[in-house]
Amino acid sequence: MSFEISVEEIDELIETGNLNIDYALKELGATSQPPPNRPLSQISKTEENNDETRTSKNSASAEAPAHASSPLRSHNEESEPGKQSSDGFSMISNRPQTGMLLMGSDTQSPSPSKTYQGLILDAKKRALNEPRRNQKTTNEHGNTNDTWIFKRGGNIATKKEAWVTQNQRSKIQSSFQDIEESTRFHGSMEEPQYQSGAIHVAHQSNQLPPSKNVHVEDVPKFANYALEILDAIKALEVRLDRIEGKVDKIMLTQNTIQQTKNDTQQIKGSLATIEGLITTMKIMDPGVPSKVSLRSLNKGPEQVPIIVTGTGDVSKFVDQDNTITLDPLARPILSGTKQITDERRAGVRIDALKITVSEMIRDLFGDCDKSRKLLESINMATTEQDINSIKTNALRSIT
């Protein structure tokens, strides 16, 4: 992997250093505001005229920014967060870095000019004329490439730069190790000296990220009410369990519903059959002829012959009043026989009728005063007519 510093990046570094110098000189009161928008010709003339008139005050002022460069670097880096080089790698970091600066060969730093533009020209010339060392590094695939690596951070009090290889950097024993930006760091077995603090020793991953950009929309939002969300989810789970139980019960009753439908269809078929049979029946009302006019009904009774079959001679059934007594089946009987039969069975019929009417009254009225009075009157009745009259009065009182 090769890190080459372009001219634009050098300009940015020089401009950052000049801003730090201006700030330090302004704090020391050893400089004045440079005239804005001076042409390049005037800058060169001013630089030539001031070569012989530099004082020790300016020399001391030029050394002062080296001690105050750490806070100024952070200030300038924060003021320029969006600057990046064309190849996606910027030497200006947007965050503070800690580490040790490995020193190379000392370069003679010229005394600063009195003007702002003069300092810029001196720094550009010094950066362009300084020779670069080509060194060999080995990447993660085992291939050897000629490249140079620039190490930033650490003690910035001295104005020195270092070009070191990957193997030399891995052998350094330091209490402060940065993450080496996008290069590999093989790790350190040394325990951190500070157990607490903002930055500890961090081991870099062996996998190089394809890009340094981060999609902001992929970052999850902060959950202010995580407990309430969990409670809501648990409540939904309970409701879902209840719904599933009810659905299971409904599925179990599905067979019963289908069986009920089949029974209903059978009942409908049977009812249709019964209705068809009823239409074929003719209900006859005895004593009421079907085709008789009103005139024929209003006629007086006529003498008609009566044929009695199966009994033989009926003269023995004729009583003294010249009448014949018939039983419920219209059979002629002796009048004395009927009376004897009625007297023998009258008590059994009355007792059965009393029991029937008493149970009916208890079901209708329950245990109340009216029910007791009706039961007493039934017990005191001796004939069927009395019991029937009590029954009729009880039914009328309900309606």
Curated annotation (Swiss-Prot):
<protein>
    <recommendedName>
        <fullName>Phosphoprotein</fullName>
    </recommendedName>
</protein>
<keyword id="KW-0597">Phosphoprotein</keyword>
<feature type="compositionally biased region" description="Basic and acidic residues">
    <location>
        <begin position="45"/>
        <end position="55"/>
    </location>
</feature>
<comment type="similarity">
    <text>Belongs to the rubulavirus/avulavirus P protein family.</text>
</comment>
<feature type="compositionally biased region" description="Polar residues">
    <location>
        <begin position="105"/>
        <end position="115"/>
    </location>
</feature>
<feature type="compositionally biased region" description="Polar residues">
    <location>
        <begin position="82"/>
        <end position="97"/>
    </location>
</feature>
<feature type="region of interest" description="Disordered">
    <location>
        <begin position="129"/>
        <end position="149"/>
    </location>
</feature>
<keyword id="KW-0693">Viral RNA replication</keyword>
<dbReference type="InterPro" id="IPR004897">
    <property type="entry name" value="P/V_Pprotein_paramyxoviral"/>
</dbReference>
<dbReference type="Pfam" id="PF03210">
    <property type="entry name" value="Paramyx_P_V_C"/>
</dbReference>
<feature type="region of interest" description="Disordered">
    <location>
        <begin position="28"/>
        <end position="115"/>
    </location>
</feature>
<feature type="compositionally biased region" description="Polar residues">
    <location>
        <begin position="136"/>
        <end position="147"/>
    </location>
</feature>
<comment type="function">
    <text>Essential component of the RNA polymerase and the nascent chain assembly complex. Also required during RNA synthesis.</text>
</comment>
<feature type="compositionally biased region" description="Low complexity">
    <location>
        <begin position="59"/>
        <end position="71"/>
    </location>
</feature>
